[in-house]
């Protein structure tokens, strides 16, 4: 999130997020940002218009079995990661809390097989409970403040089917102290919560982006049958 963004956009996002957090509506500012962008992707700090490179790398190196496998993309933004999974053969549902983001995905990919829906990660539909073979979570948890972190992690884990996997891409921080977000990178103890809610870590890669002073991880978790 916010990689190499102009200072004024970064400042604007921080302001929007700060007001939303003060009102205890931490997800409310995303719709404002998408609406105000008026179709200009340069105004969406995380929009790369391509799948995340660590997802691409995972798909290339793991060659996952995708036929009739149901995938869920959390906080799908403008849809590039969802499209990459669909291209590999997954039956993809992708959701975001922002109706404007979802409409934007449908406009960008009119022939897509992805089912794009508006939904709230903190109030997921009951039929999604443990329903997905592959869950992709990229840079959404870090975009929400620490006071909702446990609930967010529980919700992300809750949609993983028995035998299914979660692929997580996120920034991490080295201390337990509260960072000045957004983004709010995850701590070691927060990552541990995935295991406390029934998942087991299968693979973890750490990426240091020293020019940005950013540490990211890509972790694959599995829910045992
Ligand atoms: C930092 S962006 C990341 C988007 C995308 N995952 C990526 O990596 O490009 C966070 C996304 O999460 C969405 N979001 C925020 N709160 C949410 C919630 N409670 N439920 C679902 N989506 C949410 C936002 O609208 C936004 O598209």
What are the roles of these predicted feature ranges?
Residues 139, 143:
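Short catalytic micro-motifs in class I SAM-dependent methyltransferases
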Residues 133:
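Conserved acidic residues
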Residues 136:
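A conserved beta-strand element that flanks and buttresses the S-adenosyl-L-methionine
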Residues 1-72, 77-128, 144-159, 163-225:
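Class I (Rossmann-like) S-adenosyl-L-methionine-dependent methyltransferase catalytic domain
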């Amino acid at each position: 999130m916010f990689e190499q963004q102009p200072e004024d956009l970064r400042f604007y996002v921080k302001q929007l997020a700060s007001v939303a957090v003060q009102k205890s509506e931490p997800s409310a500012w995303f719709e404002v940002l998408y609406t105000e962008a008026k179709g200009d992707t340069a105004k969406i700090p995380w929009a790369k218009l391509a799948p995340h490179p660590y997802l691409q790398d995972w798909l290339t190196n793991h060659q996952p079995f995708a036929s009739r496998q149901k995938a869920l993309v959390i906080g799908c933004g403008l849809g590039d990661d969802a499209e990459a999974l669909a291209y590999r053969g997954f039956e993809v549902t992708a959701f975001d809390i922002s109706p404007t983001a979802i409409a934007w995905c449908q406009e960008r990919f009119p022939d897509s097989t992805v089912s794009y829906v508006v939904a709230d990660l903190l109030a997921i539909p009951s039929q999604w409970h443990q329903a997905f073979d592959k869950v992709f979570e990229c840079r959404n948890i870090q975009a929400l403040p620490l006071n909702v972190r446990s609930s967010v992690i529980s919700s992300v884990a809750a949609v993983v089917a028995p035998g299914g996997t979660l692929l997580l891409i996120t920034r991490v921080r080295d201390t337990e102290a509260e960072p000045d977000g957004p983004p709010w990178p995850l701590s070691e103890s927060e990552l541990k919560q995935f295991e406390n809610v029934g998942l087991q870590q299968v693979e973890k890669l750490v990426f240091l982006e020293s020019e940005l002073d950013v540490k990211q991880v890509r972790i694959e978790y599995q829910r045992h049958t």
